[in-house]
Amino acid sequence: MKILLICHDGAQLDQVILARWLSSFSNLVGIVIIQEPPSLLWRRVRREVKRIGAFRFLDVLALRLYYRIFLSGKDQQWERQELREKCFIYGDIPSRTAILETPSPNTQETETFIRRLNPDIVLARCKVLLKESIFSIPSKGTFVMHPGICPEYRNAHGCFWALANRDLTKVGMTLLRIDKGVDTGPAFGYYTYPFDEVHESHIVIQHRVVMENLDALRSKFLEIFSGTAAPLNTSGRPSAVWGQPWLTKYLQWKSHAKRGRQ
């Protein structure tokens, strides 16, 4: 089973841990490392302002600032510990693994790189929507570990919005096969863990729904490769796209969570 990983430069849990994990049960033929130019950040900012308005975007920025001041230190400590533990479990990737550094996963260079390696499966751990010319290359499909339960919590922050909405049975990750839509492809599994919404941040919860389920995910990828995995039936369920987290919703969530413990 040949697998290729797409991830962002500096995303250590993906670039290091998931790469080692994939290599432990498959032939990790390549890694596409995305090094985005600053212009893409401003493009995302303009798109989000247009979508939710300038006032609500201040709410988004307020949470970013709050997180950096009050939460990021503890989360970075958790990530360092996770890296140490998982690097002890999973050995380094082979030196033969091909590496491509690119500003975008949708370039012609990336397409040529993936076609040359001819993976059976691509695991895309990136914020960028992939072109069909990219995600259609692997014979078994391109998959994402979506941070949210689909179809109810589509887009990049589904775990946060499920927590903020007190929809606690929908806090988890969906293994999706990419199609032409935004998180609309067939789901092959839901994954969660006994999260602590009082003491853990939404970022840690979003990471742990993946990291606590690596054994189960390994089994699922092997089923997908062998052709025995069937997509879940999600017909008739509500579908919604969610945006960036807000500070007001974060504070409401934590307040509800703490009251629930009393």
For each feature predicted by the language model, list its residue ranges.
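One-carbon transfer enzymes
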Residues: 1-262
